[in-house]
């Protein structure tokens, strides 16, 4: 059985935004499970992490929410990406691409790819 690790600091917002971009509206539990699945079940997203992140993203205007009914007929808050959220995804992806390129220089010395 694989050991799960907590989501890396500073990455959850991007993972949430990219999940909503790819999947469309989802409730918090669905977002958390999708992030875990996408990571190959290497990452663990708990309620104490996902819901504060969703609240912050909503306050920033990157996502919006509305109440709906889940697959098991329970009331659930569904989150969707806003126009501002789509622009933020682009910005964050560019930043992570730069960060990844920089880290690659440290992990593979001698390979200058920037």
Regions found by a protein language model. Name each.
Residues 87-114:
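Amphipathic alpha-helical dimerization/coiled-coil segments
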Residues 6-49:
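N-terminal helix-turn-helix DNA-binding core of bacterial DNA-binding proteins
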Residues 58-75, 80:
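Beta-hairpin "wing" of winged helix-turn-helix
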Residues 4-6, 61-62, 113-114:
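Short, contiguous hydrophobic alpha-helices characteristic of membrane insertion segments
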Residues 74-93:
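Basic, amphipathic "hinge/linker" alpha-helix immediately C-terminal to the N-terminal HTH DNA-binding motif
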Residues 1-10, 92:
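Intrinsically disordered, low-complexity serine/threonine- and proline-rich regulatory segments
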Residues 50-57:
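Basic amphipathic alpha-helical segments that dock to polyanions
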């Amino acid at each position: 059985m694989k050991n799960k690790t907590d989501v890396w600091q500073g990455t959850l917002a991007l993972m949430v935004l990219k999940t909503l971009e790819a999947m469309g509206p989802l409730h918090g539990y669905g977002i958390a499970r999708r992030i875990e699945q996408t990571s190959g079940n290497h990452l663990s997203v708990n309620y104490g992490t996902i819901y504060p992140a969703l609240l912050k993203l909503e306050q920033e205007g990157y996502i919006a929410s509305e109440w709906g009914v889940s697959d098991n007929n329970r009331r659930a808050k569904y989150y969707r990406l806003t126009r501002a959220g789509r622009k933020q995804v682009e910005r964050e992806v560019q930043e992570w691409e730069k960060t990844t390129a920089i880290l690659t220089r440290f992990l593979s010395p001698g390979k200058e790819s920037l």
